[in-house]
């Protein structure tokens, strides 16, 4: 791995710190603003140089598509967008690792999931939040779970009655998801045990 110039080290440190504080990499515009570049294109050139030196990977097609290669993979894996038909913790879904003590929660957190949408806002789970999840299939009615219906992953409150399962939102603008286990496949990926927002546990 080649040595970094002082400027490249600045860019790398900014990316690492941004991921540790917010759970996601910065955009090119954010890098440019933080380091005083004239434009996001200047940030892009530094990112390409870092990629050539093997310290980051640029993921095409995403404004935050930066993955650190030098980081040790300690901490909780952060799961972003999940592709259909693939395991939740598949390598390609892991955006990075978040340095937090999994023992802060009981039961302990095994991974973080980036929340998409506002269906659970009335209990304080907002779009973009990171949900701390304990990986288990042993859940009870009334608990907030991460569920996979066929190929879609969702966060909802569980209500099970025989072969019928309702996944209940915490927002009156959303309808419950009703699953007939005789016709659809439902997999419980885990139990919600906490929320992180803007780098702070709630």
UniProtKB/Swiss-Prot annotation:
Transmembrane annotation, as ranges: none
Residues carrying the site annotation Cleavage: 84-85
Catalytic residues as annotated in Swiss-Prot or TrEMBL: 119, 156
Coiled coil: none
First-tier enzyme category under EC: hydrolase
InterPro entries named among the record's database cross-references: LexA (IPR006200), LexA-like (IPR039418), LexA/Signal_pep-like_sf (IPR036286), LexA_DNA-bd_dom (IPR006199), LexA_repressor (IPR050077), Peptidase_S24_LexA (IPR006197), Peptidase_S24_S26A/B/C (IPR015927), WH-like_DNA-bd_sf (IPR036388)
EC number per UniProt: 3.4.21.88
A biological-process GO annotation: negative regulation of DNA-templated transcription
Domain of life: Bacteria
Molecular function GO terms recorded: DNA binding; serine-type endopeptidase activity
Family stated for the protein in its record: Belongs to the peptidase S24 family.
Biological role stated in the UniProt entry: Represses a number of genes involved in the response to DNA damage (SOS response), including recA and lexA. Binds to the 16 bp palindromic sequence 5'-CTGTATATATATACAG-3'. In the presence of single-stranded DNA, RecA interacts with LexA causing an autocatalytic cleavage which disrupts the DNA-binding part of LexA, leading to derepression of the SOS regulon and eventually DNA repair.
Subunit text: Homodimer.
Protein name as catalogued: LexA repressor
Organism annotation: Erwinia tasmaniensis (strain DSM 17950 / CFBP 7177 / CIP 109463 / NCPPB 4357 / Et1/99)
Gene: lexA
């Amino acid at each position: 791995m080649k040595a970094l110039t002082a400027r490249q080290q600045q860019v790398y440190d900014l990316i690492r710190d941004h991921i540790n504080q917010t759970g996601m990499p910065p955009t090119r515009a954010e890098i440019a603003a933080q380091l005083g570049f004239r434009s996001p294109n200047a940030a892009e050139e530094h990112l390409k140089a870092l990629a050539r030196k093997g310290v980051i990977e640029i993921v095409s097609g995403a404004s935050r598509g930066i993955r650190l290669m030098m980081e040790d993979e300690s901490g909780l894996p952060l799961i972003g967008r999940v592709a259909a038909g693939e395991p939740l913790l598949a390598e390609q879904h892991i955006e990075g690792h978040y340095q937090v003590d999994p023992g802060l929660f009981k039961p302990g957190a095994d991974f973080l999931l980036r929340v998409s949408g506002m269906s659970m806002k009335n209990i304080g789970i907002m779009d973009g939040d990171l949900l701390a999840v304990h990986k288990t299939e042993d859940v009870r009615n009334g608990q907030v779970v991460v569920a996979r219906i066929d190929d879609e992953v969702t966060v909802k409150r569980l209500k099970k009655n025989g072969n019928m399962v309702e996944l209940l939102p915490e927002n009156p603008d959303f309808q419950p998801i009703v699953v007939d286990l005789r016709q659809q496949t439902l997999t419980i990926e885990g139990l919600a045990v906490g929320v992180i927002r803007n780098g702070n546990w709630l």
